[in-house]
């Protein structure tokens, strides 16, 4: 009886166990290249209790965002003020932000254009170090950004964890790749001369990001553009400006100059079309709809001069093909995860399933049962799917 009453956790901790030396810990998954982002086990009561408290304390008051382009309070009062509410509870006000006007957009473009050469001449290692510092700061601020992901973007707890981790991974990945790929390379000289190859930033890059990944995609676009030596104008989704602003503040804290990285929240006609049409903008990065990508493409094509690169990640018709060799339980779990995580609002979400006739009825019946078990509700509640 005494042995049965012993605490199994204490017994496990007392064992002289050791991990296999050739199996890296999750943190060291990428070896010497870079650190992996820190995961959180939401099924662990201790971790969950600590995280819940930190999240509760991360937003102590209403967040108010003011464009850094203007310092004149009188001018700020003339801008349109937008109220940000919790999508699960519209009575809960999270914060406020001001939309930029045409004058602010013009100032931002001019500022980014004027400092493009100075930023491009900053050593790539220094730019990469800034991204590493931002990654560390972002990881330390996980409770804040999880809180924003849930309250501003309506994400579930696990999705919020994944959102922060993906952003951290983007920062470290691009920092490492930039140092390895964008530094000075000495080429062979057939006659003994010194030939060197060095990549140079294009200039001003306009980044347009969506609401469904308000931190990860927003961060990834900006990180890639900045570390490559470009100045950035970033237009976040109007639904997730607070998240974008808090991330930009981390960039500034890490040493990125304010005129190198500028946030321009606003309407499409003011903060979108005017920037795309400006000939001083050298490239556009978009994650959004096919229609938006086509509209930007046509706008860029109408401009005089050299071809302007458009890097666009848009939607698609994602499919799954299931034959009789597949384990039905696993198929159903994969369908539910791919089709319904984030309420299906992902460019990678499953749209169509093709099932072999012989297993179709069984699979569909089990899928219907799994869907009936899904809980729709407040994303702040752990039981919500």
Feature map (PLM): residue ranges:
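Extended, amphipathic, non-transmembrane alpha-helical segments
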Residues: 139-145, 367
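Generic beta-strand/beta-sheet core signal
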Residues: 85-87, 148-152, 163, 174, ...
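ALDH superfamily catalytic-core signature
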Residues: 8, 250-255, 277, 283, ...
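Residue-level signal for inorganic ion chemistry
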Residues: 91, 112, 127, 149, ...
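Terminal low-complexity tails and localization/encapsulation signals of metabolic enzymes
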Residues: 1-110, 114-117, 121-136, 162-165, ...
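Conserved small-residue-rich beta-alpha loop and adjacent elements
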Residues: 184-258, 315, 329
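A structured beta-alpha segment of the ubiquitous adenosine-cofactor-binding alpha/beta core
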Residues: 194-196, 262-285
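Extended hydrophobic-aromatic, low-complexity segments
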Residues: 92-96, 105-108, 121-128, 146-148, ...
């Amino acid at each position: 009886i005494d042995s049965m009453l012993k605490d199994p956790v204490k017994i496990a901790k007392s064992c002289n166990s050791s991990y296999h030396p050739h199996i890296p810990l999750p943190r060291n998954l990428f070896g010497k290249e870079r650190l992996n982002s820190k995961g959180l086990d939401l099924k662990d009561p201790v971790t969950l209790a600590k995280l819940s408290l930190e999240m509760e304390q991360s937003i102590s008051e209403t967040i108010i965002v003011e464009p850094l382009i203007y310092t004149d309070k009188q001018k700020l009062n003339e801008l349109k003020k937008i109220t940000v509410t919790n999508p699960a509870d519209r009575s809960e006000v999270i914060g406020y932000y001001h939309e930029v006007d045409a004058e602010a957009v013009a100032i931002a473009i001019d500022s980014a254009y004027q400092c493009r050469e100075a930023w491009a001449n900053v050593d790539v290692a220094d730019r990469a170090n800034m991204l590493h510092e931002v990654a560390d700061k972002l990881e330390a601020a996980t409770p804040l950004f999880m809180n924003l992901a849930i309250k501003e973007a309506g994400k579930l707890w696990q999705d919020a964890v994944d959102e922060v981790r993906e952003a951290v991974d983007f920062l470290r990945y691009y920092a490492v790749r930039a140092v390895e790929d964008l530094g000075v390379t000495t080429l062979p000289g057939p006659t003994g001369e010194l030939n060197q190859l060095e990549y140079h930033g294009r200039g001003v890059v306009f980044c347009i990001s969506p609401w469904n990944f308000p931190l990860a995609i927003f961060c990834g676009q900006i990180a890639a553009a900045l570390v490559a030596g470009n100045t950035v104008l970033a237009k976040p989704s109007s639904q997730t400006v607070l998240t974008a602003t808090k991330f930009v503040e981390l960039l500034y804290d890490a040493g990125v100059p304010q005129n190198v990285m500028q946030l321009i929240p606003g309407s499409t006609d003011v903060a979108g079309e005017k920037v795309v049409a400006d000939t001083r903008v050298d490239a556009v990065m978009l994650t959004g709809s096919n229609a938006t990508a086509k509209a930007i493409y046509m706008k860029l094509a109408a401009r005089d001069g050299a071809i302007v690169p458009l890097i666009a990640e848009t939607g698609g018709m994602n499919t799954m093909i299931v034959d009789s060799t597949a384990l039905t339980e696993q198929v159903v779990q994969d369908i539910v995860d791919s089709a319904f995580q984030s309420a299906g609002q992902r460019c990678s979400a499953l749209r169509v399933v093709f099932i072999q006739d012989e297993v179709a009825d069984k699979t569909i019946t089990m899928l219907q049962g799994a869907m009936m078990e899904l809980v729709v509700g407040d994303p702040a509640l752990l039981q919500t799917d």
